A protein has these predicted regions:
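Aromatic-lined carbohydrate-binding/catalytic grooves of carbohydrate-active enzymes
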Residues: 82-124
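Aromatic- and acidic-residue-enriched segments that line the glycan-binding/catalytic groove
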Residues: 97-110, 151-194, 233-272, 324-335
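Substrate-binding cleft/loops of secretory-pathway carbohydrate-active enzymes
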Residues: 152-155, 239, 305-372, 376-377, ...
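Active-site neighborhood of glycoside hydrolase catalytic domains
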Residues: 216, 220-224, 228-232, 237-238, ...
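Substrate-binding cleft of secreted/luminal carbohydrate-active enzymes
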Residues: 347-463
Length: 463
């Protein structure tokens, strides 16, 4: 869930880059009205799960070579009242922290440290994921493994360099996304200016070779039999509607609509713009179907190897604009084409590509500003959760959670009073519990007591 960095100062950038979140381009914020803290949901007898995310990059310096540090922090996680951990084992470079027959092991990642912006290296040979599974289970924690899905490399800012499969294997360039730039279609691997093009290099979700590769990787991951497997960045890339306009995508789209596109790509969107053409809504449906169909394949791949492992995704809760990522995470019973302004981008069959009914659980990023906890609209933590639940329509248990290190007002710490409120807003609005992103922020800003207070306040309502 790693964001683009908001470079305001060296200090803010250090905090931000050390532990980021998936937040592709977002719209103007709609704050809505504040509500009373307690919410209106009635207490439930059964405890809901409490997850804490463990981002690979944000925690790499502390965990990559130290089992003792992992043990120490997991004890704190348990004592604080969390029930589950979500361990990121495939960051945006695409390399992995588990044994795989198809992916390279993660050996280094870019971080901000006391020494500045540097590469952090892993020299240890012990199994990273297995260690979390062993140590977490000893404490009674459930251990979920998370991967960044359609990613294959990372170009660092400041000239630090790059890493990942797309950079090591030139033959994989055809797997990278192609954007609908002004005047021509451009493979993102041809965009290598570290001042303007830095960030994640995505893979094309419509490329069948890419999908087969990722399914093999998921099969390897499922052999660990974690309590859950979660797909992050299972979407199109940060260029939004400009992606993907490769020959492979054109071929698949024409099969989808049953005819040739006479003027590609302008009949979909005018190059370099988001001005819609005649096929615009069908293109949005095609992209959503591409992700929907991959979710089904991924679910089946995991279950074939480890039937008891729960399968889910992380998505941004901003449904009103998440279509630009090619994802419909809602229930297929929810029809956006009949829901006000959504009809401008959603065709009548867009609902058919909602994938919530193919999941065991889902995580909604409720990434609002620090002073926008309670409310009923998007861009409030509580509103994100309530609106998300309405679109999921009971198809899947869902957990919402804030980003307590990167969102507006959270960046510099000192927000311990807002952490319990965030926990309250999420856990009472979500039937599947809550999560916090990320453990590195809890540790960095010493939010342990604040987390425990929020969880204890909730537990008092169910006992």
């Amino acid at each position: 869930m790693k964001k683009k960095l908001w470079i305001a100062s060296f200090f803010c950038l250090c905090l931000f880059a050390s532990c980021g979140g998936d937040d592709n381009k977002v719209p103007d914020w709609n704050w809505g009205e504040e509500e009373e803290e307690g919410g209106t949901d009635k207490p439930e007898a059964k405890e809901k799960p409490r997850y804490v995310w463990i981002d690979a990059a944000g925690n790499f310096e502390r965990y990559a070579n130290s089992i003792d540090n992992i043990k120490e922090d997991l004890r704190k996680v348990k004592e604080t009242g969390f029930t589950d951990i979500v361990v990121d084992v495939r960051p945006t470079t695409g390399d992995v922290l588990f044994k795989s027959s198809v992916a390279e092991p993660l050996k280094r990642i870019d971080i901000w440290s006391n020494a500045g912006y540097v590469w952090a290296e892993r020299t240890a040979t012990w199994d990273y994921l297995q260690t979390f599974l062993d140590e977490g289970h000893k404490l009674g924690l459930k251990v979920n493994a998370c991967i960044n899905t359609f990613v294959g490399g990372y170009l660092c800012p400041y000239g630090l360099g790059y890493e990942g499969m797309l950079y090591r294997d030139a033959s994989k360039k055809k797997w990278a996304t192609v954007i609908n730039a002004t005047g021509r279609q451009v493979n993102t691997m041809d965009l290598q200016n570290y001042e303007t093009d830095w960030g994640v290099k995505f893979l094309n979700p419509a490329n069948n070779e890419v999908q087969e590769y990722l399914l093999s990787l998921l099969s390897d991951l499922a052999k660990y039999k974690p309590d859950g497997i979660i797909l992050d960045r299972c979407r199109y890339d940060d260029y939004g509607l400009m992606s993907d306009f490769s020959p492979e995508s054109r071929t698949e789209f024409e099969l989808f609509i049953g005819e040739s596109v006479e003027n590609f790509p302008a009949d979909i969107m005018k190059p370099g713009t988001d001005i819609p053409g005649k096929w615009y809504k069908r293109w949005n449906a095609f992209r959503a179907k591409t992700i929907h169909d991959f979710i089904i394949k991924a679910h089946d791949e995991v279950k074939a190897v480890s039937p008891d492992t729960r399968f889910g995704t992380y998505v941004g809760a901003w449904y009103s604009t998440y279509y630009t990522s090619g994802v419909n995470w809602a229930s297929p019973k929810y029809n956006p084409a009949a829901d006000g302004s959504y009809s401008r981008w959603a065709d009548s069959d867009y609902k058919d590509y909602g994938y919530a009914d193919h999941l065991d659980f889902i995580f909604l990023g409720a990434y609002a500003a620090v002073d926008k906890i309670y409310g009923s609209t998007e861009w409030t933590v509580q509103g994100f959760c309530k609106l998300g639940g309405a679109k999921l329509m009971g198809d899947v248990p869902f957990a919402g959670g804030p980003d307590i290190g990167n969102g507006s007002g959270w960046e510099n710490g000192g927000q311990a009073n807002q952490v319990p409120k965030s926990i309250n807003a999420c856990i009472n609005a979500c039937d599947g519990g809550m999560f916090l992103f990320d453990l590195c922020h809890i540790r960095m800003h010493n939010y342990w007591d604040a987390c425990k207070q929020g969880i204890d306040n909730y537990l008092k309502t169910v006992k």
